[in-house]
Amino acid sequence: LGLHRLKQQGALMPQKERLSVIGSEQHRALARKAADKFVTLVKDTRNYLPIRPDEHRRIRLFFLSGDGKVIAGKLMKDDSHKVKEHFIQALEKEGFIVEESEQTEKGKMEEFKKKYDLCLVVINLIGFAQYNTIRMKWKQPVEQPWYVSEVPTVFVSLNFTNHLIDIPMAKAYINAYVNS
């Protein structure tokens, strides 16, 4: 690669004044544009999408988050609670009624079906460069998607692209790549 020569020529790293563009508003705008543009619909075998308040007004939100992320050997807390609140606010702003709480018991399927028009499972599991995959871990058995055959269910992965292997029963799956 000739990195040693570039270093000798002073061309390996940009000059300090050229580094000032990193994190600039222009770069942040480009990042937002890329994040919006590259969301991928992986599958929608039952035509659940798009979701609309007139058809899917009552949404049951299931939000899966991890333990944080490891950077330089240190466990860092993630911002899952903020991401979850953002999802709820955005859905409510569009006219949806969103219910989200930890589920401790399954209950009766008929009651669940009467109560919700759609289930939205948001997967915000975050890793870092040392992981090439993060497997989904359900905190309790009742959190597993037992309802997918009865209630339209859309899964959205916010970070890793390979969660579908853990939820083969998913009829609708979206990769969003980032949680912003």
Predicted feature locations:
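Preference for extracellular/luminal or secreted protein segments
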Residues: L1-S180
